[in-house]
Amino acid sequence: MQIFVADKSQLTVIRDLAYKIWPDAYGEILSEAQLDYMLENFYAIPALEKQMEMGHVFLLAEENDVFYGFASYEVNCKSTGKTKLHKIYVLTETQGKGVGKLLLSAVEKAAIKASNSHVFLNVNRYNNAQEFYKRLGFEIIHQEDIEIGQGYLMEDFVMEKPL
């Protein structure tokens, strides 16, 4: 399994993975309308390009020309000396096989290289992924609700891991 930094030519791969993974990850948490709204607003190619321009680094997990997941992160997010894990998603059928750990490990290495003290993330309060993060050393530090338009909220825990 290779983990590598994606470039703009691979944003369609990231978008396609998101459209495959999100219904499984959020289908029981979010309404279909909110799911569609978020995919359209966060994973349209112009939105992904803007995220790259804002300093988000995208990683892809690939083996034998098959893509299994992706992550994005931002070192020294908002000048905090901490790295924000913005996204990490793995195809449902490969969860539990170490792909997520490999992606997270690559993010942690980048954070350490940038002399950041922690990695932090937002996770939906009803998402089972919290358990994955807890097993890997993250702790809930607070919760927040983020308005994202059209009356939708992201109801999240903020989790953090010291490096």
Region locations from a protein language model:
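Extreme N-terminal starter segment of soluble prokaryotic enzymes
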Residues: 1-3
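Acetyl-CoA-dependent GNAT
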Residues: 5-11, 15-93, 104-106, 110, ...
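Active-site acidic-Proline motif in GNAT/NAT acetyltransferases
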Residues: 91-97, 125
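Short polybasic/polar patches that bind polyanions
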Residues: 95, 112, 134
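Residues forming the Rossmann-fold NAD(P)(H) cofactor-binding site
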Residues: 101
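Conserved GNAT acetyl-CoA-binding A-motif
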Residues: 111-122
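Conserved catalytic-core motifs of GNAT/GCN5-like acyltransferases
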Residues: 120-124, 134, 139-157
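Helix-turn-helix
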Residues: 129
